[in-house]
């Protein structure tokens, strides 16, 4: 295999994609991958950053926004992914050993016993020039690595990040979006960054009116808030019902984006695939959490 790019981030991205594909499709033979040339051998992992908490604010009673700073954030704006994998210090792993680049070009962990737990979160707002970004955390009961960390986060705390991760958003003239609290940061970012001419409708489900937050919507997408008002998250069908009720316009490029509890995501995905015959190039329906599972 040969990879070539004019920029180190691009080269690292290509090598990562190629090595991942080889490991997946040739997993039975388990070939050894050893790169030569630039960015070869063990060393600093290009997609890793050690981030520092700048400040923590309460957006709503159950949503915190944490601003983090880190060096060289250009790659997080270059590859289209909205998300990052966050590596959290915990009581059981208070001093993590961070990942490095292995000889195969992929993530390598020098000490598995000090490998931190990780979860995927959305970059809510990214300021490359300022060297900082915001991540919104839903604070909730039960065991949750991300929620527990965010609840205790203070200025100066450290956390690792890998990324960006996730499928890039395809350009479209019209969108239908649906999200509960877990997908809300991504919807907010999209509404603040898509072209002003973008049309469509976005449904956002939250616990009650107190959880509604300000979104600087720069598009022509209509935003509708849905309140559970006492219904437990994951039990209401209102969000999926609303998204599935939308008629897609003809003669414009459309895109469907949905992120919520697993059962709701499956309903919407099945509707888009089976009832409307829409493919992966036109839709994303993701399970951001599963009812009954610890986070």
Positions of the model-derived regions?
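Extended, composition-driven regions rather than compact fold-specific motifs
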Residues: 2-295
């Amino acid at each position: 295999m040969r990879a070539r790019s004019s920029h180190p981030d691009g080269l690292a991205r290509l090598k990562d994609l190629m090595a991942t594909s080889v490991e997946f499709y040739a997993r039975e033979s388990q070939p050894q991958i050893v790169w030569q040339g630039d960015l070869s051998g063990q060393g600093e992992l290009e997609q890793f950053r050690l981030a520092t908490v700048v400040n923590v604010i309460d957006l709503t009673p159950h949503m915190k926004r944490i601003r983090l700073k880190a060096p060289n954030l250009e790659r997080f704006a270059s590859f289209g992914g909205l998300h990052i994998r966050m590596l959290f210090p915990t009581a059981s792993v208070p001093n993590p050993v961070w990942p490095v680049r292995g000889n195969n070009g992929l993530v390598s962990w020098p000490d598995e016993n000090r490998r931190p737990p990780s979860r995927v979160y959305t970059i809510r707002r990214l300021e490359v020039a300022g060297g900082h970004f915001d991540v919104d955390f839903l604070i909730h009961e039960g065991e949750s690595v991300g929620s527990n960390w965010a609840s205790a986060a203070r200025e100066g705390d450290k956390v690792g990040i890998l990324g960006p991760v996730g499928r890039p958003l395809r350009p479209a003239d019209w969108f239908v979006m649906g999200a509960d609290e877990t997908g809300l940061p991504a919807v907010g970012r999209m509404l603040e960054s898509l072209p002003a001419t973008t049309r469509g409708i976005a449904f956002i489900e939250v616990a009650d009116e107190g959880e509604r937050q300000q979104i600087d919507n720069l598009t022509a997408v209509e935003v509708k808030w849905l309140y559970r008002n006492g219904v437990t998250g994951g039990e209401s069908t209102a969000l999926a019902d609303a998204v599935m009720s939308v008629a897609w316009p003809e003669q414009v490029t459309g895109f469907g984006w949905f992120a919520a509890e697993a059962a709701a995501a499956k309903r919407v995905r099945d509707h888009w695939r089976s009832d409307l015959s829409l493919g992966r190039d036109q839709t994303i329906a993701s399970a951001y959490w599963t009812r009954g599972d610890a986070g």
